């Protein structure tokens, strides 16, 4: 998955312990996959939203002026076996030819938070030049109009990256990835309180037991209040691995747990999503026997 080169996506130790999943866990590659990227699947009110390349009528990916692919969010029909059918691109006049990706949704499906690009160049102290960093926006769904009222979250400083938003089940906390001052790894996990999807509290970095000296990306909070995220920290199975952390824990020394195979693989595994039944969901992966890009996989018996 590639976003604009100057819009560093940053997806891309803490000792990891084996997270013992049942040997019956089943993971299958979805039929919707092809040589393009498919990732960040989320189920909302019986429909599946996911991110993929914007494409032309001939099926080729659309690129920007930097020759990098543009991404959009698609909505499909959820089949009983987890397959995604009849995908359609979410259309909005406020989102034409822009990267819109890695979204999270309120339970009622009325609000969407997603990753996009700054339109104002920020300072990149490492590269000593201005870059267009990533930001988080919020949109509202209005019947008959679709997704409207695109708003950049007020704490998104153009000098830093803000990406991969994830709402808590009750909608009062937004988790995300950032590179703001105070980040100890290449990208860390943060959170902020949310009130009525209009006002936001103080940005707080998650603890050092969760963040590492490497990259943390794609957070997700399940219905039982467990935080899932991907990291390339030491001790993994290869590339990006998916980890779990119980947000209900009172143990300040508790460390994230690496998920076992077949959820994690020797390739990059990221963008974990678990349905409210706590047994089925989706992951994205670049593993062996894939279709060539980021592929979507459906898992069951978790």
Give the residues covered by each predicted segment.
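Short, conserved micro-motifs composed of acidic
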Residues: 21-302
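Bacterial Sec-dependent N-terminal signal peptides
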Residues: 1-23
């Amino acid at each position: 998955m590639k976003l604009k080169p100057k819009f560093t996506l940053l997806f891309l130790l803490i000792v990891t312990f084996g997270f013992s999943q049942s040997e019956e866990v089943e993971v299958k590659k979805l039929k919707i996959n092809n040589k393009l990227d498919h990732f960040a699947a989320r189920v909302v009110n019986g429909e599946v939203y996911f991110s993929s390349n914007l494409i032309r009528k001939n099926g080729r990916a659309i690129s920007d002026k930097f020759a990098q692919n543009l991404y959009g969010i698609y909505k499909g029909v959820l089949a009983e076996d987890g397959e995604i059918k009849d995908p359609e691109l979410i259309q909005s006049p406020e989102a034409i030819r822009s990267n819109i990706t890695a979204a999270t949704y309120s339970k009622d499906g009325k609000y969407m938070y997603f990753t996009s690009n700054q339109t104002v160049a920020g300072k990149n102290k490492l590269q000593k030049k201005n870059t267009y960093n990533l930001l988080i926006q919020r949109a509202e769904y209005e019947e008959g109009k679709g997704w409207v009222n695109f708003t950049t979250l007020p704490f998104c400083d153009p000098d830093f990256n803000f990406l991969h938003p994830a709402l808590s089940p009750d909608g009062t906390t937004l988790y995300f990835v950032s590179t703001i001052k105070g980040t100890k790894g290449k990208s860390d996990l943060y959170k902020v309180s949310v009130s009525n999807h209009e006002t936001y509290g103080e940005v707080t970095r998650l603890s050092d037991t969760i963040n590492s000296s490497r990259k943390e990306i794609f957070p997700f909070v399940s219905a039982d209040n467990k935080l899932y995220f991907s990291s390339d920290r030491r001790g993994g199975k290869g590339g990006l691995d998916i980890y779990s952390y119980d947000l209900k824990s009172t143990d300040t020394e508790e460390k994230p747990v690496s998920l076992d195979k077949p959820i994690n693989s020797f390739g990059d595994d990221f963008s974990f999503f678990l349905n409210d039944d706590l047994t089925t969901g989706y992951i994205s992966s670049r593993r062996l026997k894939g279709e060539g890009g980021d592929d979507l996989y459906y898992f069951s018996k978790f």
